[in-house]
Amino acid sequence: MPTRARLALMTAAFLWAISFVATRVALETVPPLMVVTLRLLISALCFLPWIVAAGGTERIDLRRLGQLFLLSLFGTSLHYGTQTAGLQYTTASNASIYTTTGPITILLLSAVLLGERITFRKAVGVLVAVAGVLVVMGWETLSSFELGNVKGDLLVLASIVMWGLFTVFGKKMTDELGALRVTAWVTILGAATMIPIGWTEARTKGFSLADTSGEAWAAIAFLGVACSFLATLLYFVALGLSESQKVGVYLYTIPPMTAVVAALYLGEVITTNLVVGSILVIAGVALTERG
């Protein structure tokens, strides 16, 4: 993997790790789907100057626009929608464990849809990284797993499949159109699809933007600019430079980074599990890169 792709992925993973802390701050006064809507709107505004400078839709035909719209659904509305709905019916522990299947999903989908080879080293690397994430979670989280509401579990798994499809099809479109163009259109179209969803949630819960605290606005601004704009752009830059399987495994670096950020910002304890698990994740990523 080129050094540029590796740096892009590590930066994106770090920003997404911080996003969990920022999201917790935002959710104190803002409903979840409205948080998603606002962060995507802010991210879309970051891309608008480029869209105008590039000549708007003159540079892209309607067929491509339709493909980008479908891609935006996988990465925004469908992904966030099924994830949020699933969390209403299943436990957070179940959801966190299911997220470890993300890179495995990407590994399988990229083999079927893109023809990328699943080598022995790649497979072992992903499994080692999975083990690392499970160690970071710890026995308390794993032991709290329960076969509760199947509906919720299936919805969370569906959200993971959506992100896998987003990554695989995003890789294909990035190769054809370039990272900046794909990320810009996916973000803008995703924001457009989230507006009615966020508005419906706000109306149902009686939420008003005036209820949002200054700290929550700062968190949402960070989520929009750093996480939805910059991190997603870097993710697509990496997809344009490397195989989606090798890119996907970097998602396993997010849980250890999140734990470190939580320790620094929220005062949570850095445990032996975190250290050992992080070493396994790094080893797994290294194996997959060389696969």
Name each model-derived stretch.
Residues 18, 22-25, 29, 43-61, ...:
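Membrane-interface helix-cap regions at the ends of transmembrane helices
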Residues 13, 36-38, 95-101, 168-192, ...:
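Helix-helix packing/entry segments at the starts of transmembrane helices
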Residues 9, 63-70, 118-131, 153, ...:
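Cytoplasmic-side transmembrane-helix entry/capping segments in multi-pass membrane proteins
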Residues 34-45, 75, 80-126, 159, ...:
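Specific alpha-helical transmembrane segments that line the substrate/conduction pathway
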Residues 15, 19-20, 48-99, 109, ...:
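Specific transmembrane alpha-helical segments of multi-pass solute transporters/efflux pumps
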